[in-house]
Regions:
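Glycine-rich beta-to-alpha active-site loop
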Residues: 81-119
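Nucleotide phosphate-binding site architecture
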Residues: 22, 63-66, 119
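Conserved CoA-thioester-binding segment of acyl-CoA-metabolizing enzymes
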Residues: 1-52, 76-79
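Glycine- (often His-adjacent) and acidic-residue-rich active-site loop
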Residues: 50-80, 96
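A short, glycine- and basic residue-enriched loop/turn
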Residues: 21, 54, 59, 115-117
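Hydrophobic/aromatic residues within transmembrane alpha-helices
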Residues: 14, 49, 61, 103-104, ...
Length: 119
């Protein structure tokens, strides 16, 4: 899975996992939609979204640039996070660029390390 999730008590933890920089691809977008549905069905009080490894998410996966766009599209994923009944919190480290920045902005709250790059 490009995205993994688990819960501890009433808190969900969703982790982006597409090494080396968590580039956002179609599988990750699909998994994020599934994670939002999971969080709502579990009745969680909050979800913390973070990236495994050295980045939160460094933007779009360049391997998909020359291919036709496949649903779900990033704006649909961001909208699903924004409108979720469960508040999402982006825990940002490393880089959150392009689509990674959009994912972070789609969360209700954001917290970042002092050395994080968002753009």
């Amino acid at each position: 899975m490009a995205v993994t999730w688990h819960k501890h008590e009433n808190c969900g933890f969703v982790m982006l996992n597409n090494p080396p920089v968590n580039a956002i691809n179609q599988k990750m977008r699909e998994d994020l939609i599934d994670a939002v549905t999971w969080a709502e069905s579990e009745g969680l009080e909050r979800v913390i979204l973070s990236g495994m490894g050295r980045s939160f998410a460094a933007g779009a996966d360049t391997k998909e640039f020359d291919q036709p766009a496949i649903s779900p599209h990033l704006p649909d994923v961001v909208n699903r996070i924004e409108t979720s009944t469960v508040p999402w919190i982006a825990a940002i480290h490393g880089t959150a660029l392009g689509g990674g920045g959009e994912l972070a902005l789609g969360c209700r709250y954001r917290i970042a390390r002092a050395d994080a790059t968002i753009g």
